[in-house]
Regions:
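Glycine-rich beta-alpha loop elements in corrinoid/cobalamin-binding modules
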Residues: 4-183
Length: 183
């Protein structure tokens, strides 16, 4: 089922269907929540064109982080996969305009297990098939177009190694090299 714009202040809002069989797919919607809420001058917008009646305040800032943490508080072990523009743009260490600093992957702040980035219509099917076959979310490290957390690179097929978050924060040239590899 789809739970559009759940109330992030009430965990009951994400419990309407009970625990899903395969996992939760979380998106901030068709527009990044920060871009939707603030102008380039960092002034708060008055209208949310993607909410009923243009009402502002129906979704939080950094929605994928907030929604995913809400789910994780309630469903401790259920797989959570992030997707959409907000998660895709923040899938790895990234510059955050709103806080004027380099931040680590949204995967770490959100408590989610995986990100399906870009046009995820193929990768999300592969993820669902893998989960349906009985694979643990921690073992799904081989699907192109995904980012996942692992304790050891031994379980990752052909990993792409990027500079650490600390290296990116301290050196703009490392940040540029990492960005180049990503794209």
């Amino acid at each position: 089922g789809i739970i559009p714009q759940p109330d992030w202040r009430k965990k009951e809002s994400i419990q309407v269907f009970g625990e899903p069989r395969l996992g939760f797919l979380v998106s901030a919607g068709n527009m990044d929540s920060m871009v939707n809420h603030y102008t380039v001058s960092k002034k708060h917008r008055q209208k949310d064109s993607y909410s009923p009646g243009g009402q502002m305040g129906l979704r939080p800032d950094r929605a994928v982080i907030v929604y995913s943490n809400l789910i994780r508080q309630t469903y401790k072990k259920t797989p959570i996969i992030l997707g959409g523009i907000e998660a895709s743009l923040r899938r790895l260490a990234h510059y955050d305009y709103w806080e004027n600093k380099v931040k680590h992957s949204v995967l770490l702040d959100s408590g989610a297990d995986m990100i399906s980035y870009g046009m995820g219509e193929h990768s999300i099917i592969e993820i669902a098939e893998a989960l349906d076959s009985g694979l643990s979310i921690q073992d799904i490290t081989y699907i192109p177009g995904t980012v996942c957390k692992v304790k050891s690179l031994d379980s990752v097929y052909e990993p792409t190694i990027l500079p650490s978050y600390e290296q990116l924060k301290e050196d703009k040239l490392n940040y540029a090299r990492s960005f180049y590899v990503q794209y």
